[in-house]
Protein backbone atom coordinates (compact mmCIF):
# COMPACT_ATOMS: atom_id res chain seq x y z
CA UNK A 1 0.00 0.00 0.00
CA UNK A 2 1.35 3.41 -0.97
CA UNK A 3 1.63 6.33 1.44
CA UNK A 4 0.84 10.02 0.92
CA UNK A 5 1.39 13.03 3.18
CA UNK A 6 -0.90 16.05 2.79
CA UNK A 7 0.19 19.21 4.60
CA UNK A 8 -2.64 21.37 5.89
CA UNK A 9 -5.07 18.49 5.65
CA UNK A 10 -7.85 19.31 8.10
CA UNK A 11 -10.14 21.32 5.83
CA UNK A 12 -10.82 22.50 2.30
CA UNK A 13 -8.64 21.23 -0.51
CA UNK A 14 -6.34 19.37 1.88
CA UNK A 15 -9.08 17.36 3.55
CA UNK A 16 -10.79 16.57 0.24
CA UNK A 17 -7.45 15.42 -1.15
CA UNK A 18 -6.84 13.20 1.85
CA UNK A 19 -10.27 11.63 1.39
CA UNK A 20 -9.60 11.06 -2.32
CA UNK A 21 -6.45 9.12 -1.55
CA UNK A 22 -8.24 7.12 1.15
CA UNK A 23 -10.92 6.19 -1.38
CA UNK A 24 -8.17 4.90 -3.66
CA UNK A 25 -6.71 2.67 -0.95
CA UNK A 26 -3.68 4.67 0.18
CA UNK A 27 -2.14 5.17 3.61
CA UNK A 28 -2.91 8.83 4.28
CA UNK A 29 -1.21 11.20 6.71
CA UNK A 30 -2.12 14.84 7.22
CA UNK A 31 -0.64 17.73 9.16
CA UNK A 32 -2.24 20.61 10.99
CA UNK A 33 -0.79 23.52 12.93
CA UNK A 34 -3.62 23.24 15.48
CA UNK A 35 -3.93 20.15 17.64
CA UNK A 36 -7.67 20.60 18.18
CA UNK A 37 -8.35 20.75 14.44
CA UNK A 38 -6.32 17.62 13.83
CA UNK A 39 -8.02 15.74 16.66
CA UNK A 40 -11.47 16.63 15.36
CA UNK A 41 -10.72 15.38 11.85
CA UNK A 42 -9.02 12.20 13.02
CA UNK A 43 -11.93 11.38 15.31
CA UNK A 44 -14.26 11.51 12.30
CA UNK A 45 -12.11 9.28 10.09
CA UNK A 46 -10.32 6.28 11.53
CA UNK A 47 -8.43 5.74 8.27
CA UNK A 48 -6.57 9.03 8.61
CA UNK A 49 -3.38 9.55 10.59
CA UNK A 50 -1.75 12.85 11.34
CA UNK A 51 0.74 15.05 13.10
CA UNK A 52 0.69 18.54 14.56
CA UNK A 53 3.19 20.45 12.44
CA UNK A 54 3.43 23.98 11.11
CA UNK A 55 4.18 24.34 7.43
CA UNK A 56 7.16 26.61 8.14
CA UNK A 57 8.71 24.43 10.87
CA UNK A 58 11.81 22.61 9.59
CA UNK A 59 12.18 20.40 12.65
CA UNK A 60 8.54 19.31 12.37
CA UNK A 61 9.02 18.53 8.68
CA UNK A 62 12.06 16.39 9.42
CA UNK A 63 10.43 14.49 12.27
CA UNK A 64 7.11 13.98 10.46
CA UNK A 65 8.65 12.52 7.31
CA UNK A 66 10.91 10.24 9.34
CA UNK A 67 8.02 8.99 11.51
CA UNK A 68 5.90 8.18 8.46
CA UNK A 69 8.68 6.12 6.89
CA UNK A 70 9.33 4.39 10.22
CA UNK A 71 5.63 3.50 10.53
CA UNK A 72 4.82 2.47 6.96
CA UNK A 73 8.16 1.69 5.35
CA UNK A 74 7.75 4.32 2.64
CA UNK A 75 6.66 7.81 1.70
CA UNK A 76 5.51 7.80 -1.91
CA UNK A 77 3.81 11.16 -2.47
CA UNK A 78 3.99 14.58 -0.82
CA UNK A 79 1.19 17.11 -1.29
CA UNK A 80 2.35 20.62 -0.33
CA UNK A 81 -1.10 22.06 0.34
CA UNK A 82 -0.70 24.16 3.50
CA UNK A 83 -0.96 27.87 2.82
CA UNK A 84 -1.86 31.18 4.38
CA UNK A 85 -2.75 34.75 3.44
CA UNK A 86 -2.57 37.17 6.38
CA UNK A 87 -1.14 39.92 4.20
CA UNK A 88 -3.95 41.43 2.13
CA UNK A 89 -3.40 44.96 0.90
CA UNK A 90 -1.12 47.03 -1.26
CA UNK A 91 2.53 45.99 -1.21
CA UNK A 92 3.36 49.59 -0.34
CA UNK A 93 1.24 49.50 2.81
CA UNK A 94 0.94 45.92 4.03
CA UNK A 95 2.68 44.97 7.27
CA UNK A 96 6.05 43.45 6.42
CA UNK A 97 5.82 40.81 9.14
CA UNK A 98 2.63 39.54 7.51
CA UNK A 99 4.38 39.46 4.14
CA UNK A 100 7.23 37.45 5.66
CA UNK A 101 4.78 35.01 7.24
CA UNK A 102 3.04 34.54 3.89
CA UNK A 103 6.29 33.80 2.11
CA UNK A 104 7.57 31.54 4.90
CA UNK A 105 4.47 29.33 4.77
CA UNK A 106 3.66 29.43 1.07
CA UNK A 107 7.15 29.30 -0.41
CA UNK A 108 9.74 28.22 2.13
CA UNK A 109 7.32 25.67 3.57
CA UNK A 110 7.00 23.57 0.40
CA UNK A 111 10.77 23.71 -0.08
CA UNK A 112 11.39 22.52 3.49
CA UNK A 113 8.88 19.69 3.27
CA UNK A 114 10.12 18.57 -0.13
CA UNK A 115 13.73 18.50 1.01
CA UNK A 116 12.91 16.55 4.16
CA UNK A 117 10.64 14.13 2.30
CA UNK A 118 13.39 13.42 -0.21
CA UNK A 119 15.91 12.89 2.60
CA UNK A 120 13.46 10.42 4.17
CA UNK A 121 13.28 8.47 0.91
CA UNK A 122 10.37 9.97 -1.05
CA UNK A 123 9.74 7.58 -3.91
CA UNK A 124 7.35 8.96 -6.52
CA UNK A 125 6.08 12.53 -6.67
CA UNK A 126 5.51 15.96 -5.17
CA UNK A 127 2.42 18.05 -5.86
CA UNK A 128 2.42 21.77 -5.02
CA UNK A 129 -0.85 23.64 -4.59
CA UNK A 130 -0.17 26.93 -6.38
CA UNK A 131 -2.74 29.50 -7.56
CA UNK A 132 -3.82 31.47 -10.61
CA UNK A 133 -2.69 34.41 -8.51
CA UNK A 134 0.83 33.31 -9.32
CA UNK A 135 0.05 33.75 -13.02
CA UNK A 136 -2.01 36.96 -13.06
CA UNK A 137 -1.59 39.84 -10.58
CA UNK A 138 -4.59 41.16 -8.69
CA UNK A 139 -5.32 44.08 -6.40
CA UNK A 140 -4.63 43.70 -2.68
CA UNK A 141 -3.15 40.18 -2.90
CA UNK A 142 0.37 41.02 -3.98
CA UNK A 143 2.27 39.23 -1.22
CA UNK A 144 0.21 36.07 -1.61
CA UNK A 145 0.45 36.12 -5.39
CA UNK A 146 4.21 36.62 -5.31
CA UNK A 147 4.55 33.58 -3.05
CA UNK A 148 2.51 31.49 -5.47
CA UNK A 149 4.47 32.76 -8.48
CA UNK A 150 7.60 31.64 -6.68
CA UNK A 151 6.04 28.26 -5.98
CA UNK A 152 5.22 27.82 -9.66
CA UNK A 153 8.85 28.43 -10.57
CA UNK A 154 10.04 26.22 -7.70
CA UNK A 155 7.87 23.40 -9.03
CA UNK A 156 9.70 23.51 -12.34
CA UNK A 157 13.11 23.87 -10.72
CA UNK A 158 12.57 20.91 -8.40
CA UNK A 159 11.17 18.83 -11.25
CA UNK A 160 14.47 19.31 -13.05
CA UNK A 161 16.58 18.64 -9.96
CA UNK A 162 14.70 15.53 -8.78
CA UNK A 163 14.28 13.86 -12.17
CA UNK A 164 14.29 11.05 -13.09
CA UNK A 165 13.50 9.60 -9.67
CA UNK A 166 10.76 11.91 -8.37
CA UNK A 167 8.18 13.83 -10.39
CA UNK A 168 7.17 17.34 -9.31
CA UNK A 169 4.00 19.04 -10.53
CA UNK A 170 1.62 21.74 -9.39
CA UNK A 171 -1.94 22.88 -9.75
CA UNK A 172 -3.18 26.47 -9.98
CA UNK A 173 -6.79 26.87 -8.84
CA UNK A 174 -8.90 30.00 -9.19
CA UNK A 175 -11.53 30.72 -6.51
CA UNK A 176 -12.45 27.54 -4.64
CA UNK A 177 -15.06 27.47 -1.88
CA UNK A 178 -12.74 27.07 1.08
CA UNK A 179 -12.20 28.88 4.37
CA UNK A 180 -8.89 30.31 3.14
CA UNK A 181 -10.50 31.97 0.12
CA UNK A 182 -13.73 32.95 1.90
CA UNK A 183 -12.99 36.66 1.75
CA UNK A 184 -13.07 36.44 -2.05
CA UNK A 185 -16.59 35.03 -2.34
CA UNK A 186 -18.55 35.04 0.89
CA UNK A 187 -20.15 38.48 0.43
CA UNK A 188 -21.10 38.00 -3.23
CA UNK A 189 -20.90 34.38 -4.31
CA UNK A 190 -22.66 34.96 -7.62
CA UNK A 191 -20.44 37.90 -8.49
CA UNK A 192 -17.35 35.84 -7.71
CA UNK A 193 -18.68 32.92 -9.73
CA UNK A 194 -19.29 35.21 -12.69
CA UNK A 195 -15.56 35.95 -12.86
CA UNK A 196 -15.17 32.41 -14.21
CA UNK A 197 -16.26 31.41 -17.73
CA UNK A 198 -18.15 28.44 -16.28
CA UNK A 199 -20.04 30.80 -13.93
CA UNK A 200 -19.40 28.75 -10.83
CA UNK A 201 -16.83 28.50 -8.08
CA UNK A 202 -14.61 25.50 -7.69
CA UNK A 203 -15.27 22.86 -5.07
CA UNK A 204 -12.47 21.24 -3.05
CA UNK A 205 -13.41 17.88 -4.57
CA UNK A 206 -12.76 19.24 -8.07
CA UNK A 207 -9.22 20.13 -7.12
CA UNK A 208 -8.63 16.89 -5.20
CA UNK A 209 -9.40 14.84 -8.29
CA UNK A 210 -6.73 16.67 -10.30
CA UNK A 211 -4.23 16.39 -7.47
CA UNK A 212 -4.79 12.66 -7.30
CA UNK A 213 -4.35 12.22 -11.05
CA UNK A 214 -1.08 14.15 -11.16
CA UNK A 215 0.21 12.19 -8.17
CA UNK A 216 -0.75 8.78 -9.53
CA UNK A 217 0.86 6.39 -11.98
CA UNK A 218 -1.58 7.62 -14.63
CA UNK A 219 0.57 10.76 -14.80
CA UNK A 220 3.89 8.92 -14.85
CA UNK A 221 5.17 10.89 -17.87
CA UNK A 222 4.23 14.31 -16.51
CA UNK A 223 6.68 16.41 -14.53
CA UNK A 224 7.42 20.11 -14.20
CA UNK A 225 3.86 21.07 -15.12
CA UNK A 226 1.54 23.47 -13.29
CA UNK A 227 -2.01 22.75 -14.42
CA UNK A 228 -4.62 25.47 -14.09
CA UNK A 229 -7.98 24.38 -12.72
CA UNK A 230 -9.90 27.62 -12.84
CA UNK A 231 -13.32 27.28 -14.42
CA UNK A 232 -12.14 29.56 -17.21
CA UNK A 233 -10.96 32.35 -14.88
CA UNK A 234 -7.91 33.12 -17.02
CA UNK A 235 -9.74 33.14 -20.36
Residue ranges, per PLM feature:
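Alpha-helical segment proximal to the catalytic Tyr-Lys
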Residues: 119, 159-164, 220
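Active-site helix of classical SDR
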Residues: 114, 147, 155
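Catalytic Tyr-X3-Lys loop
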Residues: 92-111, 127, 144, 151
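Residue(s) in the substrate-gating loop at a strand-loop-helix junction
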Residues: 131
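Conserved mid-core segment of classical short-chain dehydrogenase/reductases
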Residues: 85-100, 140-143, 182-185
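A glycine/serine/threonine-rich, flexible loop-to-helix segment
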Residues: 41, 170, 174-196
Amino acid sequence: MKTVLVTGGTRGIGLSTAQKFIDQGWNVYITSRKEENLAAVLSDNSQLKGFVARADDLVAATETCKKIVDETGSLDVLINNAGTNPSGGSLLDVDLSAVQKTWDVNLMGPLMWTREAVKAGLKESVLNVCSVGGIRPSQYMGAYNISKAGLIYMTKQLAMELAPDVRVNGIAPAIVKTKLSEMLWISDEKGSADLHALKKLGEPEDVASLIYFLSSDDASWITGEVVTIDGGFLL
